[in-house]
């Protein structure tokens, strides 16, 4: 049975929630589910914006059929070719043989790759600045390459002043019936998943996001319709401000994220001592055991916090496996402008601090705070002083006392 929601007089959400998908893109856990958003414009001409993942195709088809109310779609606008938004394209084309497919030139090539040349031949290519009049509505296409694939388009509806923003401004998490961001406590219930979505899906492409934000600033945008997560119809400055901050790689929170790996608990103990000394100084601290917490959550808070501490034992002459993976993951997302500190452990040859520093060294705008702390097997009184000094250095750096 269909499950749709009206956005305004002419736009209808025809997407679907999915709570059965364990891993988004095969790697990111989504314990609270995810929404695959698609939108239908019913005017003199009808326009379907994107399709959905195969996981929700049955609900999607029922939604589209209901929202069309006996009509057929004149156009399918393809903003993004990733299969979680384009999987149903071929089926829609078979169901509606007279429907015109609109997409970028790069997307047309991808249609031939994901599907076949016959489907690609039905495409009309649109580019930056092209417009489509559907009757009452005039749509303008906006190129948004590498947010986060090269073929991405966005669509601005000049009439209703809304921006269909592809993967930008999205979030992990099912909608649970609440389509609009103002229907939930976004700060409390959604922001962490919006940040985790941004950091892991879009985060590498901060410069490209800045270009899109500049384009949006030149438009009168009163509503944002992303391909995942909530529709924004109020307080757009909130999410636009978050994207501006994240895409400039500026921290949201002055505080410390401590990410640690520990084989037998001794490195964890040292990390806990450091956390206590920081908290005593009034510093906000978040801790993760990187062997337990999936990397996407740690990467997300690396985007959030101003200061990062990495603590790990030496393992087979190198950085402990899960810490090595985390640091490479952070590097692959191109995170910039962070202050960091290191804590290493080793029973006979502690070398982890140097090796972690080497993984961090290529990252832009990263600066080390304090001297690395070395633990030999377990922390003793001699190391307590070094940990105390590191806590003082970090707290002083946050407060500006070290400047």
Role assignments for model-derived ranges:
Residues 175, 186-224, 228-231, 273-288, ...:
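FMN-binding flavodoxin-like domain, especially the glycine-rich phosphate-binding loop
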Residues 4-65, 154-157, 161-165, 267:
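Conserved beta-strand hairpin/beta-sheet module of binuclear metal-dependent hydrolase folds
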Residues 5-9, 103-152, 205-211:
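Metallo-beta-lactamase
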Residues 45-47, 75, 137, 161-164, ...:
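Structural motif
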Residues 49-51, 73-81, 101-104, 163-166, ...:
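Active-site neighborhood of phospho(di)ester-bond hydrolases with catalytic His/Asp-centered motifs
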Residues 148-152, 168-203, 247-251:
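Active-site-proximal loop/helix segment associated with metal-binding centers of metalloenzymes
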Residues 44, 55-102:
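Active-site metal-binding motif and surrounding structural segment of the metallo-beta-lactamase
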Residues 88, 293-298:
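Short acidic active-site motifs
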